[in-house]
Structure formats: structure tokens, C-alpha cells
């Protein structure tokens, strides 16, 4: 599907002309603009106010060098980013990603998606994203600490609890957040909720670690229930083996599903008896080892080289939880051919546009990431609330709030899709629902 509306088409063409090399960012923008056609057609005042032009252009982009010294005494230099995309509904909020693939296009796409995701939570959070091409894998704790301290030595001047509140993402877990927070506190000499995903002893929220994976399953549960189905007795395939995948495994299992396959960038494992999330957590979070190590714990499991093959494993429910554009058209065809009837995205934009189109054409229940993986940032918002109130809620309290937020996101996306004559199209429903709140705020605040 291509953009039909002349105004939206003109905005997209102008954006593509200015950013021809930023394919991930352009992909994210195109998907959203396609969904917004009926809304923009009903509101000609948006064009007069240049609303869409402002929506797709970040308010601020920060790029900086990050020099640090490795354990051999050699100076290394990486590049750091922070894209402060939109603050119409609250302070910039979004994670930091440390991975060799990180570039400006990826950070801009993530920041753009974050705007709509944060809007859907109904919490007062704008959209932003950041990171670096630094690879924490294979680095010592001391090297990671030195890098994080150097990174924050520049980033601190752009952050603040009411300005910009980063969190974790790929390559940025509790260890990295701790180092970043420590350096911020040292430089600013103040103790504020400037980062989320912190450790429990220094202002973190219970259930934050589990939130994205749990939230994904809560969203999928609602979507399945509307179709008269549930997780009970279903075969579940989860790509990835990081934070999102591990806790999606735990919650899917608690809801009655059986997770039979998981992956990392090297390959995937199949365990017909159900993959034990505790074993996966030990391998990935404690040993920081490759997924093949699962065979040392469960010799009856099978390991296959190459992560793409995971989509050929017969399943009922697929949860892509690894990285962007991992589920391509061939993977979507394999899922449909093998009887999969539900795909819910746990990673950010893990499915390519042609894969999504194929799944929708074949009647597959499809949950888009900006709605179904919003649990992480929702609980980050709850962590910000606890920090502001100087309170700490119990795990059960946070989990209940998370569950309610995910149920409301599903209902809002589904109702919005139906309102605009696209019943069941949660991609359009989530895009429009997220946009409407941001658009209303931007129109109220003038040309800024």
C-alpha cells in the first residue's frame, strides 16, 4: 500500500529527499503516514499548521564522540546519539541502545515509534531514543563502566527528570543503567529520576525488568480473547533471548502456552517439552553466553545454526522479540503455511512491511510493536511516578497497573480501527490513536 493523500505524500517525498540513506526511519514514517490518511482528510487544519512536517522532524538531534580506554590501555572512540523527537505530551522518554549496528537512521526510527507508543500508554511522556555503536558483548565490566561514564559525561547536559529520561534497550541492561546513573549523580550532584530501569536499591521499580515481555503477553491475551482463543495449550515461538523474550516466555507459560523455540543472532533452539525461562535467564543474564549453551542444561533440545530458521518451526503463536526487520516475507509465509494464527511483536518494528501485509491478507491476528511492546515504557513511566512521589510500589501493584494499561491500549487501538472503518487492523488503530493525542497537543501549543 502506498500513501494516497497528496499532502502526506508530499511530506514523505520531502523527508525521503532530505534523508535518502535512512531506510529504517523512512520505513517507520511511511507506515504511520499510510494509516493517518483518513484522519488527515478529516482535519484540513493539520496541513495549514504544518503538523505532519513537524511531526516527522525531530525537535533535536545530538551526536557526540565517546572516547574511552580499554583494558589493554588502548584508546577507543565510539559515536553517541540522542534524538529528542517530540515533547508535546511530556518530557522525552525512550531507551538507549548499545550495538554495532546503531546509526542515526535506527535511532530516528526508534524515536519516532516511541512518540506513538508513549502516547498510547496515556502517561505524560514524549518520544526520544539514543545509543551508541559500542558493543558491550565481550567487554569486561571495567570497560563497560568506563564507556558508560564517558557516554554520560556528554549526555548529562541534555537529560533531566522533567526534560529527557532515558532507559535501557538492546545492550543496555541493569549493569549499564547503574554505571550511567552513577556518573550522572557524580556530575550533577543530585539524586533524581533521570533514568529508568534502575536497580531496586537506588530508585528502580519492581516489575520493570519483566514489563515488556509481560505486557506483550497481556496485549496478545486480549487480542486472542476477542477472537475466542487463548494461550492455553498453544505452541509458542519466540525469537530472541534477551530481556523481552525471556519474560515473554515466562508469562506465556504462566498463561498456559508452551514455548518451544527461542533464538539469538547465531541460531535457535527447539525444546518440545517447553523452554525453561529460568535456564535461559541463567545463560543470557548471568553467563552472558550463546543460546547453544542451552543444550548443556537440556541435552534433549535441538540447536540449529542461523536465526532465520526459527520461523519454520510449526507453532500457533509467534512473538518476534529480537530486532527490527527480523520477520521477513519468507518467514511470514512459513508461519502461515505451518498453521500460525497469531503474531504479536515484542521487538521494535520486527516485521517488514511485506511480511505484515502477507499476514494481514491471510487473516492472521497481528499486534504491532508500538502497541504490544509498550509495557516496558509504561512501567518506566510508573517508575518515574514512584521517583517523583518518593514511594515504592509492590510488584503486584506495578504488575496490576501494567496489565490495566495494556488492556486499555488494546481496547483503544481496536476501537479506533473500527471507528475509521478498519476493524481488526491494529496497525492502523494504534497509529491513529497514538497520533490523535499528540496532534491535539501540538495544535494547542502553536507553531513550535
Located regions from the model:
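Predominant activation on well-ordered alpha-helical scaffold segments within soluble catalytic domains
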Residues: 12, 30, 104, 108-112, ...
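Rossmann-like adenosine-cofactor binding region
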Residues: 267-366, 371
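Glycine-rich beta-alpha junction loops
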Residues: 84, 129-132, 171-172, 242, ...
Amino acid at each position: 500500500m502506498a500513501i494516497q493523500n497528496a499532502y502526506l505524500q508530499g511530506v514523505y517525498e520531502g523527508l525521503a529527499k532530505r534523508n535518502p540513506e535512512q531506510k529504517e526511519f523512512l520505513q517507520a514514517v511511511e507506515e504511520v503516514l499510510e494509516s493517518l490518511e483518513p484522519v488527515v482528510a478529516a482535519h484540513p487544519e493539520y496541513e495549514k499548521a504544518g503538523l505532519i512536517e513537524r511531526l516527522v522532524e525531530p525537535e533535536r538531534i545530538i551526536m557526540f564522540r565517546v572516547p574511552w580506554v580499554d583494558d589493554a590501555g588502548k584508546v577507543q572512540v565510539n559515536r553517541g546519539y540522542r534524538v529528542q523527537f517530540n515533547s508535546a505530551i511530556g518530557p522525552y522518554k525512550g531507551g538507549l541502545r548499545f550495538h554495532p549496528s546503531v546509526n542515526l537512521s535506527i535511532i530516528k526510527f526508534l524515536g519516532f515509534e516511541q512518540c506513538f507508543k508513549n502516547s498510547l500508554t496515556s502517561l505524560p511522556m514524549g518520544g526520544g531514543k539514543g545509543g551508541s555503536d559500542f558493543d558491550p558483548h565481550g567487554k569486561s565490566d571495567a570497560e563497560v563502566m568506563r564507556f558508560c561514564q564517558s557516554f554520560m559525561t556528554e549526555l548529562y547536559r541534555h537529560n533531566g527528570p522533567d526534560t529527557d529520561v532515558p532507559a535501557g534497550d538492546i545492550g543496555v541492561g541493569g549493569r549499564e543503567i547503574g554505571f550511567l546513573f552513577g556518573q550522572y549523580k557524580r556530575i550533577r550532584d543530585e539524586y533524581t529520576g533521570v533514568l529508568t530501569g534502575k536497580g531496586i536499591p537506588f530508585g528502580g521499580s519492581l516489575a520493570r525488568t519483566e514489563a515488556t515481555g509481560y505486557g506483550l503477553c497481556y496485549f496478545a491475551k486480549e487480542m486472542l480473547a476477542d477472537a475466542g482463543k487463548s494461550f492455553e495449550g498453544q505452541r509458542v515461538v519466540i525469537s530472541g533471548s534477551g530481556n523481552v523474550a525471556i519474560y515473554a516466555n515466562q508469562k506465556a507459560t504462566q498463561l498456559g502456552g508452551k514455548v518451544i523455540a527461542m533464538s539469538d543472532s547465531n541460531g535457535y533452539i527447539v525444546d518440545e517439552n517447553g523452554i525453561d525461562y529460568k535456564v535461559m535467564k541463567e545463560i543470557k543474564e548471568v553467563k552472558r553466553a550463546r543460546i547453544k549453551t542451552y543444550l548443556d542444561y537440556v541435552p534433549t533440545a535441538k540447536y540449529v545454526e542461523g536465526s532465520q530458521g526459527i520461523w519454520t518451526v510449526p507453532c500457533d503463536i509467534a512473538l518476534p522479540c529480537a530486532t527490527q526487520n527480523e520477520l521477513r516475507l519468507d518467514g511470514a509465509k512459513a508461519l502461515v503455511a505451518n498453521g500460525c494464527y497469531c503474531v504479536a511483536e515484542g521487538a521494535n518494528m520486527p516485521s517488514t512491511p511485506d511480511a505484515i501485509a502477507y499476514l494481514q491478507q491471510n487473516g492472521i491476528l497481528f499486534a504491532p510493536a508500538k502497541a504490544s511492546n509498550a509495557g516496558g515504557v509504561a512501567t518506566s513511566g510508573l517508575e518515574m511516578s514512584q521517583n517523583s512521589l518518593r514511594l515504592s510500589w509492590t510488584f503486584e501493584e506495578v504488575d496490576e497497573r501494567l496489565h490495566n494499561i495494556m488492556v486499555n491500549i488494546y481496547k483503544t487501538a481496536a476501537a479506533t480501527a473500527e471507528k475509521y472503518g478498519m476493524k481488526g487492523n491494529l496497525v492502523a488503530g494504534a497509529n491513529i490513536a497514538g497520533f490523535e493525542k499528540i496532534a491535539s497537543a501540538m495544535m494547542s501549543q502553536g507553531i513550535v
